[in-house]
UniProtKB/Swiss-Prot annotation:
Protein's membrane topology: Single-pass type I membrane protein
Region named Interaction with DYNLT1: 491-512
Post-translational modification: Phosphorylated. Constitutive phosphorylation is in part catalyzed by its own kinase activity.
Gene name of this polypeptide: ACVR2B
Matches recorded under InterPro entries: Activin_recp (IPR000472), Kinase-like_dom_sf (IPR011009), Prot_kinase_dom (IPR000719), Ser/Thr_kinase_AS (IPR008271), Snake_toxin-like_sf (IPR045860), TGFB_receptor (IPR000333)
Protein name: Activin receptor type-2B
Localization of this protein: Cell membrane
Quaternary structure annotation from Swiss-Prot or TrEMBL: Forms an activin receptor complex with activin type II receptors such as ACVR1B. Interacts with VPS39. Interacts with DYNLT1.
Keywords from the named record: ATP-binding, Cell membrane, Disulfide bond, Glycoprotein, Kinase, Magnesium, Manganese, Membrane, Metal-binding, Nucleotide-binding, Phosphoprotein, Receptor, Serine/threonine-protein kinase, Signal, Transferase, Transmembrane, Transmembrane helix
Role of this protein: Transmembrane serine/threonine kinase activin type-2 receptor forming an activin receptor complex with activin type-1 serine/threonine kinase receptors (ACVR1, ACVR1B or ACVR1c). Transduces the activin signal from the cell surface to the cytoplasm and is thus regulating many physiological and pathological processes including neuronal differentiation and neuronal survival, hair follicle development and cycling, FSH production by the pituitary gland, wound healing, extracellular matrix production, immunosuppression and carcinogenesis.
Cofactor names: Mg(2+); Mn(2+)
Principal location: membrane
Length: 512
């Protein structure tokens, strides 16, 4: 009876050793950085891996293969990636990426790396000069079959019960249509870092793509239509503009029931205009810069460009969910328009697609949207955007310290009148029937620039949609107001306080 129990104990001991090694074995990796001079690091050597207790550690390698010549890019430690679990060898499987990437578990396992395409293409291997086997190597290979098999079974059961893969394998072959080509799609690794926002259609992560930070908007499978719509807007010719969010890639990640739909875009650390105004009071010049670049972005989005920089025809596009949460800020407070999931294109001879009337964020809905009386024509949708722009401009003015008076805590439009979570009926009563708008404070009107800007705001949110300004007109006005105020001396400012008509604003005829 003792022999079977001894064998079982021996098996269990090797199992425990193998299990322990699976998560703790990777302590050091081969290090290499081709850009060591620019990044001011060592070129090569060994890297000691450090991470959180519940995270697994791996080694990775990335390289280029130009006509059979292997060019190393980077090697080093990599943190807790599901694709690296239980891989003793560093093997890349992508067909033809611009940069090959592989990861593995085990000390120095990235010393040797291999490209082995899943389709069965030729194997390309980089192998360092051979070294004589050591006793430790012989022992490791002797225990590897038993320990490895046991570890795989345990890990498979544990992962099934406790977690799903944090970063799935790229799977774009079932895509409903080809994403626009992007030079960064093939670059690896991409690692999710932290959730920055949650919205109607999913969450937005800050992620790292090689040496750059990017934003990853993750849609659940049930919101596939929104992901597809936003991807199609981004793929429209002429969508590259300094005041529109930069698109990088669209991908499917995972498989079967674990599929997630990713949109990868530029990352802006200051976040949305809403978040920035909550925590910051802005100056007059900052207000003008945000307002001018924001209106420039919306003006370009609305514009129909017959031949845009050789890319083809850029149609007029209505945003349909314009709000301060969907305006991002660059490091210099330049505004960038984002979230085109509800946007609609107006192409000659083609229907504009889904033009359901009551879409967007309820608080920012124009009167005609709230009462369901929309004219389903291009100009009607652009004017709806302009009503929302008036509300966002009001948010900017409400947090500006230029006027001689108190700056209140940040509040959303109509929050003072009907609270943070208004119903559709409450908004209809206030906006449509009572024709109320957010309050314009008396002390704002004593500042020459803010007073003129308030006139522009009122012409953006006019109850009569046809009387509203265009985005291009708002851009012109803000630029003119800024120059007129900044170009005056303090003596002139005193005289301007009593009259805000000293500067001729662009006429309403420049509206849509």
């Amino acid at each position: 009876m003792t022999a079977p129990w001894a064998a079982l104990a021996l098996l269990w001991g090797s199992l425990c050793v193998g299990s322990g090694r699976g998560e703790a074995e990777t302590r050091e990796c081969i290090y290499y950085n081709a850009n060591w001079e620019l990044e001011r690091t060592n070129q090569s050597g060994l890297e000691r891996c450090e991470g959180e207790q519940d995270k697994r550690l791996h080694c990775y390698a990335s390289w280029r293969n130009s006509s059979g010549t292997i060019e190393l890019v980077k090697k080093g430690c990599w943190l807790d990636d599901f694709n690296c679990y239980d891989r003793q060898e560093c093997v890349a499987t992508e067909e033809n990426p611009q940069v090959y990437f592989c990861c593995c578990e085990g000390n120095f396992c990235n010393e040797r790396f291999t490209h082995l395409p899943e389709a069965g293409g030729p194997e390309v291997t980089y192998e360092p000069p051979p070294t004589a086997p050591t006793l430790l190597t012989v022992l490791a290979y002797s225990l590897l079959p038993i320990g490895g098999l046991s570890l795989i079974v345990l890990l498979a059961f544990w992962m099934y019960r406790h977690r799903k893969p944090p970063y799935g394998h790229v799977d774009i072959h079932e895509d409903p249509g080809p994403p626009p080509p992007s030079p960064l799609v093939g670059l690896k690794p991409l690692q999710l870092l932290e959730i920055k926002a949650r919205g109607r259609f999913g969450c937005v992560w800050k992620a790292q793509l090689m040496n750059d930070f990017v934003a990853v908007k993750i849609f659940p499978l049930q919101d596939k239509q929104s992901w597809q719509s936003e991807r199609e807007i981004f793929s429209t010719p002429g969508m590259k503009h300094e005041n529109l969010l930069q698109f990088i890639a669209a991908e499917k990640r995972g498989s079967n029931l674990e599929v997630e739909l990713w949109l990868i875009t530029a990352f802006h650390d200051k976040g949305s205009l809403t978040d920035y105004l909550k925590g910051n009071i802005i100056t007059w010049n900052e207000l003008c810069h945000v307002a001018e670049t924001m209106s420039r972005g919306l003006s370009y989005l609305h514009e129909d460009v017959p031949w845009c920089r050789g890319e083809g025809h850029k149609p007029s596009i209505a945003h349909r969910d314009f709000k301060s949460k969907n305006v991002l800020l660059k490091s210099d407070l330049t505004a960038v328009l984002a979230d085109f999931g509800l946007a609609v294109r107006f192409e000659p001879g083609k229907p504009p697609g889904d033009t359901h009337g009551q879409v967007g964020t309820r608080r920012y809905m124009a009167p005609e949207v709230l009462e369901g009386a929309i004219n389903f024509q291009r100009n009607a949708f652009l004017r709806i955007d302009m009503y929302a722009m008036g509300l966002v401009l009001w948010e900017l003015v409400s947090r500006c310290k230029a006027a001689d008076g108190p700056v209140d805590e940040y509040m959303l439009p109509f929050e003072e009148e009907i609270g943070q979570h208004p119903s559709l009926e409450e908004l209809q009563e206030v906006v449509v029937h009572k024709k109320m708008r957010p309050a314009i404070k008396d002390h704002w009107l004593k500042h020459p620039g803010l007073a003129q800007l308030c006139v522009t705001i009122e012409e953006c949110w006019d109850h009569d949609a046809e009387a509203r300004l265009s985005a291009g007109c708002v851009e012109e006005r803000v630029s003119l107001i800024r120059r007129s105020v900044n170009g005056t001396t303090s003596d002139c400012l005193v005289s301007l306080v009593t009259s805000v008509t000293n500067v001729d604003l662009p006429p309403k005829e420049s509206s849509i």
